[in-house]
Swiss-Prot record:
Catalytic component of the polycomb repressive deubiquitinase (PR-DUB) complex, a complex that specifically mediates deubiquitination of histone H2A monoubiquitinated at 'Lys-119' (H2AK118ub1). Mediates bisymmetric organization of the PR-DUB complex and is involved in association with nucleosomes to mediate deubiquitination. Does not deubiquitinate monoubiquitinated histone H2B. Required to maintain the transcriptionally repressive state of homeotic genes throughout development. The PR-DUB complex has weak or no activity toward 'Lys-48'- and 'Lys-63'-linked polyubiquitin chains. Pfam families: Peptidase_C12 (PF01088), UCH_C (PF18031). One of its GO terms (biological process) is specification of segmental identity, abdomen. One of its GO terms (cellular component) is cytoplasm. Belongs to the peptidase C12 family. BAP1 subfamily. Its EC number is 3.4.19.12. This is Ubiquitin carboxyl-terminal hydrolase calypso. Its main location: nucleus. It is an enzyme of class 3 (hydrolase). It is found in: Nucleus. Keywords: Chromatin regulator, Hydrolase, Nucleus, Protease, Thiol protease, Ubl conjugation pathway. The lineage of its organism: Eukaryota, Metazoa, Ecdysozoa, Arthropoda, Hexapoda. The record marks 212 as: Important for enzyme activity. Residues 29-260 form the UCH catalytic domain.
Amino acid sequence: MNVAAGGTSAAAGSASNNNALPMAQLADGWLELESDPGLFTLLLEDFGCHDVQVEEVYDLQKPIESPYGFIFLFRWIEERRARRKIVETTAEIFVKDEEAISSIFFAQQVVPNSCATHALLSVLLNCNENNLQLGETLSRLKAHTKGMSPENKGLAIGNTPELACAHNSHAMPQARRRLERTGAGVASCRFTGEAFHFVSFVPINGQLFELDGLKPYPMNHGCWEEHEDWTDKFRRVMADRLGIATGEQDIRFNLMAVVPDRRIAITHKLKMLRTNQAIVSGTLQKLLKADEQGDDQQRPDTPNTLLEPSAFTARDLQSLLKNLDTEIAINEQHLADENDRRQMFKVDASRRTHNYDKFICTFLSMLAHQGVLGELVSQHLLPTKKISGQSAANRLSKQSSAATANTANSAANATAGKSQPQQQQQQQQQQPQSQAAKNGKSPGKTPGRRRKGRNKCRKRK
């Protein structure tokens, strides 16, 4: 173990000085990383591997073009019943042959919080070097760890300064504070306190391997059929795995694919389209010139680099040229989108890794010094109180308005009910008054009222 760590440290000694990261802090200073494809893509660039990118997989059944491998993020809780089922299932496919293990790159995770880097290296260092340019750091690591045990390979990863610095440079400030507060352990996703873990799925020598740094051995899921791609085998394995893992309705997982850099393929296609565009345009110019001269006997043919030699009319070439122009415009837009996406990865990384604590503390201190902080805090707290008070006031006003409306309705009904009898009584009173006026008597007094008046006068006397 000491030989593996020391050898890698010596090979990368100059890089440790440049990165200013003490070797004593490498083994216990790795920070947690988020599960983000943009972060992983930039991390690969920092490793020195510029021809790959990481994409998130949303649909397992959707075909993926030329993937190097897959990275699976899942919840890691040992006591779960589903977890025990997975362990019992995978124990049957462990590869325990030392020669077979040493022939592939399988490293045990001996450094906490390094599972993201382990997952990426498990994919990249098991790819064919003819199809992928690893870069100086990864090429040196692969050559140095050839034939080592999985434990020594894990120590070599932990003691490589370039990998440690690149890994920690993409961590959020909360990760460092959390490491100082709780210590190292299994990586947790987005700092929620729940443990998550990365594993890799990669094709090796016609067989699908699952490489998990927390397992003692690599797992061989077997070969795929002759008529299918290795990704078909991977889909079946993942379908079974998710069926077991989601037995308790826990579907929190993330799947990412390590694929070639899309910009390289688009750039190559644009180069081919522009070459064909120049050929067709030149042939069309010659054809138009020949038609102007009336030389139909020597009509030019399209070169065999585009199609088989055959006579084309000017209209055919113009239509072909128009299609090429459209394809070029579409691919130029795709290339611009990929470049914008890569730039957005960098912007998100800057926002993710920047420590805003000093700015926030200074800003709040200036507000307090100017005597504005208390007022701002009260203004932001009052709306909540106002909303609760207004809701109560609204309820009271609604109740009072409803009571007032009910009272008004009842009064209106009572008034409407008494209006007809009162009209009849008034009509009856008006008839004797009119008769009394004719007879010369007072119209406003009745016999009963006169008696009451006389009684009152007697009492006064």
